[in-house]
Amino acid sequence: MTDNSKIRVVVGMSGGVDSSVTALLLKEQGYDVIGVFMKNWDDTDEFGVCTATEDYKDVAAVADQIGIPYYSVNFEKEYWDRVFEYFLAEYRAGRTPNPDVMCNKEIKFKAFLDYAMTLGADYVATGHYAQVKRDENGTVHMLRGADNGKDQTYFLSQLSQEQLQKTLFPLGHLQKSEVREIAERAGLATAKKKDSTGICFIGEKNFKQFLSQYLPAQKGRMMTIDGRDMGEHAGLMYYTIGQRGGLGIGGQHGGDNQPWFVVGKDLSQNILYVGQGFYHEALMSNSLDASVIHFTREMPEEFTFECTAKFRYRQPDSHVAVHVRGDKAEVVFAEPQRAITPGQAVVFYDGKECLGGGMIDMAYKNGQPCQYI
């Protein structure tokens, strides 16, 4: 049996069941485990539900139960500078950001990793549903989590080889139901705690109300592609491409009874475009441009390859051809795709392996830019 007692693993503990079981499994495997709670958001001046204090109590309870030391570290400044400023800038530009991708890249696997090194860590570990596998050359490959419904490689796609070399994902081979069972068997304080939802720093708060505290909403016209005025929108930042709810025009029909969807935005004119039908022609595209292209292991500066891709979390894979030039890529779809959303991540896969990805800049239909922003 391997002696892991001299290998120190610092676990990012959120107060949830996944990170609790992560710490427990590593402790049972004989590692020298330290728990760390990250406080990334100052909730003292906000209305709504925020659970940071309660979450830290849960971390302390679990750490005491399994017999590991634990600390709390404050990354509020790093979070504001590296994640929240990006989040606001994307909304100002009419895009729909993905703060979870940026949070993993900049906070959980950069600021936290750096902090863990000061504690003498050999590795960091989190409760993400993903797997790492080292090949004979020492290169680490990131693989999808065994639980298809929980796989989180989409959100981890911007991690570097250097970060992956220092990372363990102890839950990657487990189903979520098994994780709950392990927690209940061990009697962990978090065994029955419900999973957190929504963007990390917003929690359960009303999104529109939250965003309006930081960005002034500018109302404007809501129109169909052919120029029919459908009323007023509350501010372009509140809508995302392909969105159905929250338009307030459910009773207005243009010749058919199909529901209305957001099909485009004109930032310069402050117009929100809407159309009827889930597969409205304005929502369909056959290629995209992406930037901030990043691979989890070394790749050529310029190359073309075929793979599968996801354009949003929990979406089935789609076949694509990718041409990479530096940190930019053109991605051509084998089949037309719906509601490709600027600001969201495009993530590349080769079977079970997550290769990396980038951020969507523009979607195209037959070579013409889609008027999504």
Swiss-Prot record:
It is found in: Cytoplasm. Disulfide bonds join C103-C200. Its EC number is 2.8.1.13. ATP binds at G12, M13, S14, G15, G16, V17, D18, S19, M38, G127. This is tRNA-specific 2-thiouridylase MnmA. One of its GO terms (biological process) is tRNA wobble position uridine thiolation. Keywords: ATP-binding, Cytoplasm, Disulfide bond, Nucleotide-binding, RNA-binding, Transferase, tRNA processing, tRNA-binding. It catalyses: S-sulfanyl-L-cysteinyl-[protein] + uridine(34) in tRNA + AH2 + ATP = 2-thiouridine(34) in tRNA + L-cysteinyl-[protein] + A + AMP + diphosphate + H(+). The keyword Transferase applies. Belongs to the MnmA/TRMU family. The active site is at C103, C200. The record marks H128, Q344 as: Interaction with tRNA. HAMAP family: tRNA_thiouridyl_MnmA (MF_00144). It comes from Streptococcus pyogenes serotype M28 (strain MGAS6180). Residues 150-152, 312-313 are annotated as: Interaction with tRNA. Pfam families: tRNA_Me_trans, tRNA_Me_trans_C, tRNA_Me_trans_M. GO terms for molecular function: ATP binding; tRNA binding; tRNA-uridine 2-sulfurtransferase activity. One of its GO terms (cellular component) is cytoplasm. Catalyzes the 2-thiolation of uridine at the wobble position (U34) of tRNA, leading to the formation of s(2)U34. The lineage of its organism: Bacteria, Bacillati, Bacillota, Bacilli, Lactobacillales. Residues 98-100 are annotated as: Interaction with target base in tRNA. Gene3D superfamilies: Adenine nucleotide alpha hydrolases-like domains, HUPs, Translation factors.
